[in-house]
Amino acid sequence: DIQMTQTTSSLSASLGHRVTITCSASQDISNYLNWYQQKPDGTVKLLIYYTSRLHSGVPSRFSGSGSATDYSLTITNLQQEDXATYXCQQGNTLPYTFGGGTKLXIKR
């Protein structure tokens, strides 16, 4: 199985600031990388698919980049509602595996 690694398990940033969350794959996943957001109430939403394509309804404050084995999610102009856990998933090879998640806390 392809191993997905998010080296930062938690981070905090201030309202209005920018954060970047990284994810690495144990082998080339050819840009088949998705980012999910899990809110504290358990709600899960797809944010970005195929590295950089924004899912319908997701604000343009969210963006993704990367290639081969290294990927990132950037959130600009942080809002209180961005407090959540963000996880990457590779969709290149079954089973489609997830990173361990990065929990983001927003400082007022």
From Swiss-Prot:
Residues 35-49 are annotated as: Framework-2. Residues 24-34 are annotated as: Complementarity-determining-1. SMART domains: IG, IGv. Pfam families: V-set. Residues 50-56 are annotated as: Complementarity-determining-2. Residues 98-107 are annotated as: Framework-4. Disulfide bonds join 23-88. It comes from the Eukaryota. InterPro entries: Ig-like_dom, Ig-like_dom_sf, Ig-like_fold, Ig_sub, Ig_V-set, IgV_Light_Chain. Residues 57-88 are annotated as: Framework-3. One of its GO terms (cellular component) is immunoglobulin complex. Residues 1-23 are annotated as: Framework-1. Residues 89-97 are annotated as: Complementarity-determining-3. Keywords: Adaptive immunity, Disulfide bond, Hybridoma, Immunity, Immunoglobulin. GO terms for biological process: adaptive immune response; immune response. Anti-2-phenyl oxazolone (PHOX) Antibody. This is Ig kappa chain V-V region NQ5-89.4. It comes from Mus musculus. The lineage of its organism: Eukaryota, Metazoa, Chordata, Craniata, Vertebrata.
